[in-house]
């Protein structure tokens, strides 16, 4: 099985798309999105002929639905939700990694010393299929029985649900809700999926439909290049990256975003040659792990070469 390497072998299409495009986030705006907001703030998108419109999801299930309905051009998906969507016949393709490491975790009350302690307890989930993967993987990885956990739907309300003790734990991102919760309640536990048997993999991936990839390659190339430059700027100038996010959104506190960015920024390029790289070996390792009997999330093995196309990512060291 082969996969196109980032920056290699792409069919050349250097024409500017000269059009608007929508990009749907995976979650409420937070530090992991700073590069996207920086790209728009600095005009990296318009310089390449695309005007990006950033949209925030109203619910956890928005991304796949809106991509398939052609109501958004791009969407950030959890890599596991991409796998599930493809298994369900949705021909979506990951074209760029936003991070190179897992962000998934279970955040739990201070009394929960190990994920095994969540047996018989109420644990909040957003409703995304990938939440079940995270919950099963972490609890089973700690020697517990995931079927004994009482799941309850909380949407994107992990912070509130944990602070009010509505739940004993919740699936959430350690770099976002985890940072906020540990600052507000220092004893909170954070159980990361890669600490319980998971491999290193790009948690968040920029995705498009196969039709967009085939019909609008110039749009995909320009958007990926603009976002890549945005994240490169954030890595070199994190303070202004925070400002770009805060200037475009409401309800965020600078100190919280700065803490989140400090936590997540190493994940932007960890183990990669360039920002956004989709490494074939890493993707295959993730697919094999997910295909394991205890953590199966699809009914057949994922075709990595069809699910990802990394050739639009600018290579390291390009001007």
Language-model regions, residue ranges each:
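Short amphipathic alpha-helical segments at helix boundaries and their inter-helical linkers
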Residues: 71-76, 265-279, 311-319
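Pocket-lining segment of extracytoplasmic ligand-binding domains
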Residues: 80-81, 157-161, 165-251
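C-terminal motif of bacterial Sec signal peptides marking the signal peptidase cleavage site
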Residues: 4-7
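Conserved C-terminal helix/tail region of periplasmic/extracytoplasmic solute-binding proteins
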Residues: 284-319
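Short, glycine-/small- and polar/acidic-enriched structural segments
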Residues: 14-164, 168-175, 190-192, 200
């Amino acid at each position: 099985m082969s996969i196109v390497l980032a920056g290699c072998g792409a069919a050349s299409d250097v024409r500017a798309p000269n059009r608007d495009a929508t990009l749907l986030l995976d979650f409420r705006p937070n530090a992991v999105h700073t590069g996207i907001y920086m790209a728009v703030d600095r005009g990296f998108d318009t310089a390449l002929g695309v005007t990006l419109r950033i949209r925030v999801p109203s619910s956890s299930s928005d991304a796949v639905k809106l991509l398939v309905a052609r109501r958004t051009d791009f969407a950030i998906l959890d890599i596991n939700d991409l796998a599930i969507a493809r298994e369900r016949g949705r021909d979506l393709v990951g074209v760029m990694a936003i991070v190179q490491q897992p962000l998934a975790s279970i955040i739990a009350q201070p009394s929960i010393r190990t994920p095994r302690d969540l047996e018989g307890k109420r644990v909040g989930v957003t409703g995304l299929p990938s939440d079940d993967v995270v919950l099963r993987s972490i609890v089973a990885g700690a020697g517990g029985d995931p079927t004994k956990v009482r799941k309850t739907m909380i949407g994107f309300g992990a912070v509130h649900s944990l602070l009010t003790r509505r739940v004993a734990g919740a699936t959430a991102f350690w770099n976002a809700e985890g940072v906020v919760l540990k600052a507000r309640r220092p004893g909170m536990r954070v159980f990361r999926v890669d600490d319980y048997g998971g491999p290193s993999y790009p948690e968040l991936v920029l995705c498009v439909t196969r039709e967009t990839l085939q019909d609008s390659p110039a749009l995909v190339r320009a958007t990926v290049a603009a976002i890549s430059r945005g994240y490169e700027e954030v890595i070199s100038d994190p303070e202004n990256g925070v400002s770009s996010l805060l200037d475009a959104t409401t309800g965020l506190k600078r100190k919280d975003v700065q803490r989140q960015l400090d936590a997540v920024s190493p994940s932007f390029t960890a183990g990669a040659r360039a920002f956004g790289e989709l490494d074939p070996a890493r993707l295959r390792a993730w697919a094999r792990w997910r295909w394991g009997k205890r953590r199966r999330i699809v009914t057949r093995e994922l075709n990595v070469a069809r699910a990802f196309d990394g050739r639009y990512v600018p290579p390291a060291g390009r001007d």
